[in-house]
Structures are given as structure tokens and as C-alpha cells.
Amino acid sequence: MATTVKDTMNVDINAIKKGEIRMGTTITALRYKDGVILAADSRTTMGAYIANRVTDKLTQLTDNIWCCRSGSAADTQTVADLLKYYLSMYRIQFGHDPSVHTAATLASEMCYQNKNMLSAGLIVAGYDEKTGGDVYSIPLGGSLHKQPLAIGGSGSAFIYGFCDANFRENMTQEEAVEFLKNAVALAMERDGSSGGTIRMVILNKDGMERKFFAIDTANPIPVFTH
């Protein structure tokens, strides 16, 4: 009997080093008119100590699928690495790229099967020529939610009102970039575990584009007066 990708998903999480470094984090993703955009801050903390100010919390899984990571840095890096491995196996076995739904389902199953040992919240998003852009949220515990807009991490609690008031479907790319930039910047101002810079990934029929926003650069982070 042929071995499937799912048959190989027997991961010994106990063998994975539990890291103290955590990504308190603000992670977001949305579906816009032509694809999807993912965005995140870049602060990594260890208790009250800021361990890294420029962490890249956006991880490429395939050519057209990326994920945002929040929770334990060690756990989420390992989950993302395993996802990349399984998705590459899927392509070899079936002869075509996996769909965003397939990638999100694998991530959800991995997190659910090990929910008592992992501290990992993910957003999986990507572009598929058949379905367009898709966004899936996988919070702690491993449940799977398909949404036009997903937010997660400690900073998300501070921007639900902003997102409810300002998000709308079928935004243009420019509108979507501005919306996510403002959302993450607002979370960074209020959440002590979010900060640093803002990184984005835009996925559409033309491929992938990355954006970077930082203080005192040509692409500055928005500053809000109180």
C-alpha cells in the first residue's frame, strides 16, 4: 500500500526543544480583490526582555503559500519547517502544488494533535489560481477557521474595534496595505509584546512581493497622536 503524506505525520513533539523565547506578536492577513496580504510586527520577547527587534514572523511554505507565526518561537519555527517538508512531499507524490486549504488543514491537524505541548498560533494564507486568495486562522488548540480577515497574537486584542470599523471585502491592494499597516501600528503602540518593524507579504497572480516599514525610512510606520 502506498504511503501518503498523512501517514508520515507522526511527529514526536517531545523531541522538540521547548523555547523560552516567545513572539508576543501581532499577526494579520486578509483577502483583497486580487489576492492576499500577510503582515506582522517584528518584536520577540523573553519575559520582559526584548530578545529581538527585527524577527521575521512571516514564513514561506510554498511558492504561493505563507504563514504568520505567534506563540513560542521554537514551537512555531518547528511547525513551519515540518509543514514545508510535508507540502514538498505532497507536490512530489501528487505532481501538483497543494492548495491553501490543504496546507491549512495539515497545520491545523499538527497543532490539534499536539495541543497540550505546543504554544503555536498560526495564520495560513496564499493564492490559488482556481479559488483566488484564501486566509485560514489556526489559534491555540488547532481549530481551523476560514476568514476574509484574520488577526492573532497578543496585540490583536487592541485592534478588534479598528478592524471591525474599517475592514471591508474586495479592497484594492493599496487600500489593503494601508489598512494592515495601520492595524499593526496601532497594536504596536498599545501592546508591550509587539513592536519593532512591520513586514508584509503580498501574494497574487503575479507572484510574491515583500514590503517593509520602519521608523526613519522611506516607508515609515504610522504614528498616531493621542
Curated annotation (Swiss-Prot):
Major place of residence: cytoplasm
Active-site residues (renumbered): T25 (nucleophile)
Protease listed as a keyword: yes
Alphabetical keyword list: Cytoplasm, Hydrolase, Nucleus, Protease, Proteasome, Threonine protease, Zymogen
A Pfam family reported for this protein in Swiss-Prot or TrEMBL: Proteasome
Catalytic activity as recorded in UniProt: Cleavage of peptide bonds with very broad specificity
One GO biological process term: proteasome-mediated ubiquitin-dependent protein catabolic process
Propeptide: 1-24
Enzyme class: hydrolase
EC id: 3.4.25.1
Role summary: The proteasome is a multicatalytic proteinase complex which is characterized by its ability to cleave peptides with Arg, Phe, Tyr, Leu, and Glu adjacent to the leaving group at neutral or slightly basic pH. The proteasome has an ATP-dependent proteolytic activity.
Protein family according to the UniProt entry: Belongs to the peptidase T1B family.
Self-association and partners: The 26S proteasome consists of a 20S proteasome core and two 19S regulatory subunits. The 20S proteasome core is composed of 28 subunits that are arranged in four stacked rings, resulting in a barrel-shaped structure. The two end rings are each formed by seven alpha subunits, and the two central rings are each formed by seven beta subunits. The catalytic chamber with the active sites is on the inside of the barrel.
Protein name per UniProt: Probable proteasome subunit beta type-1
